[in-house]
Amino acid sequence: MSSIHDLDFIKEKLEELKKAGVYRKLTVLESPSGPRSIIDGKKVINLSSNNYLGLANHPRLKKAAIEAIEKWGVGAGAVRTIIGNMTIHEELERKLAEFKREEAVLTFQSGFTANMGVIQAVVDKGDVIISDELNHASIIDGCRLSRADVVIYKHSDMEDLERVLKEVKDKYRVKMIITDGVFSMDGDIAKLPEIVKLAEKYSAITYVDDAHASGVLGESGRGSADHFNLHGRIDIQIGTLSKAIGVVGGYVAGKRELIEWLNHRGRPFLFSTALPPAAVAASIEAINILSESDALTRKLWDNAKYFKEKLKSLGFDTGKSETPITPVIIGEETKALEFSRKLFEEGVFAQGIVYPTVPKNKARVRTIVTAAHTKEDLDAALKAFEKVGKQLNII
């Protein structure tokens, strides 16, 4: 008989994970996040980082962080609505609003908490959320917390989206369409022009999670709205400071009244200590770098195009990727994990992704090249992919 006191029921659940082959241990990174990293004691080419632009170890960001610690200390000491709102926080939000070409921005502790906080503050019981079936887990959790009804539409299927919009047209006070800007497992881009047209036709709010588009799509990485020239037509944009920006945190960009409302009702914002000064200063410096030049985003896309084309020429299935996120579709879960393990033996770290993160029989090794990778890095990785792919009869 299990006892709550000694957590036997948790032990049983862990055993179930092990039997199903989905139990995992944390990978240990023993160096800064970069194109070549030390992982579990082995120096490898890193193809699994979200550090798209190589900014996580950039000297200008490190200098800004150190100077901020000297000036502001290591922590804000309070939530921003009490006494944790430093001038540096306000400066970051002004910079982000200018960069995103939006009226205002509010920062959160992560992109995950931004989604959870914004969704539940904007919609409520009596409203409806229309959500893409492949949206991120933070969107799913935010929808659950909102108390609004949730209707799922087929992934990037505009006919299905319109079908849902017709069904809910006169039944709800507020209708909100939510989509990722770039989908993290397949690397495809949301059909935002069509989504925006449908939202305008059926009087719905548009909400875009730009976590994997910020710093990647648009002029100097301004995101999906800029990529599609949709400024002023997307109501709510979520961004992250932890991927291309290279630091930590999240934010929401939009109309000033939206930000004012979130100041009063965004629960993760209201009840979490403000971002530490070092992270804020480093994020400001990252935005400065992107605003000065598009060199990093151009290098990122050059590398992504090169790597993707070479993988395809070797015979790998890269799915429907349109971005630096390039999955190598394997199919079988065990083979995908073995592929990842053998790549590591060859000096390449590329994470195997299996069910339930992706559908059954759609297991893959997901790769992300960065602006910091050299052509030599990519060629060495491709050589390993070819060798292991042939060993496992994948190509």
Swiss-Prot record:
Positions the record marks as coiled coil are none
Listed GO molecular functions?
A: 8-amino-7-oxononanoate synthase activity; glycine C-acetyltransferase activity; pyridoxal phosphate binding
Q: What residues bind substrate, as annotated?
A: H136, T357
In the UniProt record, does the keyword Acyltransferase occur?
yes
Q: Name one GO biological process term.
A: biotin biosynthetic process
Kindly report, in one word, the top-level EC class recorded for this enzyme: transferase
So what EC number does this one have?
A: 2.3.1.47
Catalysed conversion reaction: 6-carboxyhexanoyl-[ACP] + L-alanine + H(+) = (8S)-8-amino-7-oxononanoate + holo-[ACP] + CO2
- Pfam families, from UniProt? Aminotran_1_2 (PF00155)
Q: Which residues carry this modification: N6-(pyridoxal phosphate)lysine?
A: K243
Q: Where are the transmembrane segments?
A: none
Q: Which domain of life is it from?
A: Bacteria
Q: In which pathway does it act?
A: Cofactor biosynthesis; biotin biosynthesis
Name of the featured protein? 8-amino-7-oxononanoate synthase
Q: Which gene encodes it?
A: bioF
